[in-house]
């Protein structure tokens, strides 16, 4: 039976202006993909990768090209064999997973062969701002039950930022996201001092094109690859430089490759973090599946939006609760 693919562009406003290392956003730019067999509809979602300079126009062009040639891409195997890892492929791949579940009358957990977990601990991201504003946001997050906070920090003010927040929140653990902006010298200076402040992970300290020196550096805090890591083929090299990898569906090009990446990372002794990219619960439902296999879960973007999709996942006390199969998968 032939399948039909449709897509639409949407913008979902954030609760407050969100500052990343590379940009500031008022809303999350997202694409929704529907794949239908005439009876069932599978849904998927993707965002934009600033690292790849993706724009709404470029992703729309990629989706339109896939739509026009969909007869040859209507299985996950064909899609992942033909289309490179990119955000557009993510939305289509996840829609095909959802459709497969609906046609088979089985859950994503059964189809993917992953044991269902009813809830998982997640962090919440504190965006770049003044130390006082970040401290206030961090205290508000802890008041809602979060015990693991992800702090985005430039090297020049990372110590001040983390010190200010840690002093106000004893016992809370932190992930520091450097977003490729540190030098090796700054990392060596900051890491021992951040360890004393209960920082448990440093994410992507060096630029992805200049992270080879990490192979010779024994960090007191585990280092996690983000921009350096997209697909399973990179794992043998990354295992020489990092202690963990951050999996994101837009980077892997969907759930299919994300599961392969998670397996490869574990086989090489790496820790796992599941991230997100401004998604609603529709984009983060497949992330939850991979997140159930991970040590850290940065699946919080739906909480940063002014509103989520109807029927989406709930977060209470720093725990993210599993989606219902009627919503996705």
Protein language model regions, located:
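N-terminal capping/lid subdomain adjacent to the active-site entrance of alpha/beta enzymes
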Residues: 1-174, 181-188, 192-196, 309-329
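Residues that form or immediately flank small-molecule/cofactor binding pockets and catalytic motifs
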Residues: 10-12, 127, 228, 301-304
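Anaerobic metallocofactor- and corrinoid-dependent redox/one-carbon enzyme cores
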Residues: 296
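Catalytic core of soluble alpha/beta enzymes
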Residues: 151, 156-285, 289-292, 300, ...
């Amino acid at each position: 039976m032939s399948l039909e693919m449709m897509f639409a562009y949407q913008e979902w406003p954030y609760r407050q202006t969100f500052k990343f290392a590379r940009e500031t956003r008022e809303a999350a730019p997202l694409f929704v993909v529907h794949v239908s067999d005439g009876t069932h509809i599978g849904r998927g979602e993707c965002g934009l990768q600033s690292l790849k300079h993706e724009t709404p126009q470029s992703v729309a062009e990629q989706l339109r090209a896939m739509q026009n040639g969909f007869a040859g891409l209507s299985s996950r195997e064909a899609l992942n064999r033909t289309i490179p890892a990119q955000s557009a492929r993510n939305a289509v791949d996840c829609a095909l997973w959802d459709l497969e579940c609906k046609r088979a009358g089985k859950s994503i957990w059964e189809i993917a062969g992953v044991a269902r977990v009813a809830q998982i601990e997640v962090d919440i991201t504190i965006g770049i701002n003044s130390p006082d504003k970040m401290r206030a946001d961090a205290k508000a997050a802890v008041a809602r039950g979060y015990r693991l906070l992800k702090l985005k920090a430039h090297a020049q003010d990372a110590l001040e930022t983390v010190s200010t927040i840690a002093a106000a929140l004893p016992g809370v653990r932190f992930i520091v996201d450097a977003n490729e902006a540190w030098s090796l010298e700054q990392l060596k200076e900051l890491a021992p001092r951040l360890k004393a402040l209960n920082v448990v992970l440093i994410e992507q300290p060096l630029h992805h094109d200049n992270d080879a020196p990490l192979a010779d550096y024994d960090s007191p805090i585990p280092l996690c690859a983000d921009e350096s890591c997209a697909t399973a083929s990179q794992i043998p090299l990354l295992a020489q430089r990092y202690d963990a990898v951050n999996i994101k569906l837009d980077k892997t090009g969907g759930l299919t490759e994300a599961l392969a990446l998670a397996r490869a990372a574990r086989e090489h002794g790496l820790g796992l973090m599941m991230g997100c990219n401004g998604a609603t619960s529709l984009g983060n439902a497949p992330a939850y599946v991979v997140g159930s296999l991970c040590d850290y879960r940065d699946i919080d973007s739906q909480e940063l939006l002014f509103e989520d999709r109807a029927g989406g996942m709930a977060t209470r006390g720093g725990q993210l609760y599993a989606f219902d199969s009627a919503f996705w998968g």
